[in-house]
Amino acid sequence: MGRHHYADRTYTSFDPEALRDVVHQSRIEHRLLGAGDLEIRVRNRTGPRFAVGAGDYGCAVYAQGVLHPGALTISLAPMRRGEVFLNGRPLPPHALQVYAEGASIDYVTTHAACWHTVTVTREHLQAHAVGRLGRELAVPGAGCAQFEPDPALTRQVLEQIETGYRLASEPGTDAETLLCCDLALLDALTEALAHAPSTPEPRGARTRRRIMEVVESVARQGAQSAEIDAAALSRLCAASERLVEHAMRQGVGMPPKRWLTMARFNRVYVELADPGNTRSVTDTALHWGFNHLGRFASNYRAVFGESPSDTVARVRGEPRPRLTARVAATVA
């Protein structure tokens, strides 16, 4: 993964394109799920053996994508003000999720939250585990597995991650010091994963994921999703309306109608933020199924922190600063 490099970026308005690379060697799509503090801080540290990333989100967010095709990705979200769901499963604050190479991730936070990821090759992690424990770790060969170690072990992982960020941000830190920090993080990860067998999926998880996939496929239909009522969604999911509602609340923390509405709001935002867009705000809102324009404008401002016309003006005129590089340090 190259030399040691550290970057600390703060976004002061929602920029889904800039957020696509928040996890090392991954492409992650972002959608806002409600009103909140739009400031998003992203930190990334890469070294010769693995990469570490962190996102501090002040608002409810949905992030979906495919992770590094050639490495394991280990995620945790120890600090949050609401609920956090990963792949339709609630994530306890002390839990770790291990994703196999190229696995898909669906991340939902219902309020402000901070997540961390460690990207490391399977070979390097297992070699370290054999050297430390005398055996390999039971990590998944495909998909994702959730581990729930003692909270003290999770705190040690988090402390080593934060120590690495602090050292990488200091100009005088040399490469040898960072390598020692990397080894300490691998030690902490190995201990946490070794002493926490993966937890089985809760009852009904497969049905819940299937329903979530159907609802998300409807959301991706765009404007047509505005015409889908609860009965139609129930038929598409081949499940009762009550089960569809329950599955969405258990898997993403909100009912299906709100999920579909927020997906359409995000599509409007992406279109208005496109410099090549030629449709008016009114035509764009109507196209995406928002017929009550006053209510639409009010809700849009609450979610994105600006009016629809402000979005258009910002894109067509001089864009206001959306990215602030707080720290960027490279150590040979």
Residue ranges and their predicted role:
Residues M1-D37, E83-Q224, D229-E241, Q250-P255, ...:
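Alpha-helical bundle regulatory/interaction domains
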Residues I211-V215, L260-F265:
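Generic hydrophobic, amphipathic alpha-helix propensity
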Residues V244, M248, R295-F296, Y300:
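Short hydrophobic/aromatic patch on the recognition helix
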Residues D56-V61, A77-G82, Y99-A103:
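Short acidic (Asp/Glu) patches
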Residues Y269:
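C-terminal catalytic core of tyrosine-transesterase DNA break-rejoin enzymes
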Residues V66-G82, V118:
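Short, conserved beta-strand element in jelly-roll/cupin
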Residues L67, R208, T261:
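Short, conserved glycine- and acidic-residue-centered signature motifs
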Residues A35-L67:
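Conserved short histidine dyad/triad with adjacent acidic residue
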